[in-house]
From Swiss-Prot:
The gene is rplI. One of its GO terms (molecular function) is structural constituent of ribosome. Pfam families: Ribosomal_L9_C, Ribosomal_L9_N. This is Large ribosomal subunit protein bL9. The keyword Protein biosynthesis does not apply. NCBIfam families: L9. The keyword Ribonucleoprotein applies. It comes from Mycoplasma mobile (strain ATCC 43663 / 163K / NCTC 11711).
Amino acid sequence: MKVILIKDSNAGKKNQIVEVSAGYATNFLFRQNLAIPYNKDNEKFLKDVLEKEREIENEKRFEANELKTKLEKINLSFKLKASLRKDGIISVHSSISAKNILNELEEKHGLKIDRHALENVHINTIGLSKIIINLYKDIKAILLVKVEKDE
């Protein structure tokens, strides 16, 4: 018996058409609302659902690409307290966290980003650092952060 899965189950993934035994379909999949019978009406319903999901996917991907272009034009700069040690090495006394970067992006540029999207965030060196921001699935932006010594 052919069925269209509504949710992920042992038979397969959501929106997949699978062949299962009649007993498994009627006694388990239909009763648990995991599948619907395969027929022309339900096939049309499945095509509509897949088309809507594709549209939503394309819209999210487009928004992520727009945000990526905005982020890659931005250069953030911070000042950290630092001192020169006797051996000539600069010793930094504080660091820049994800919270600092997100606050700066929101206040100065009006961009709100989830804090879990940031990678390699803990910055405690003077100079230029790259922050990777995961925007959507395989779309990533690189944000440049310049850290200067505060006098």
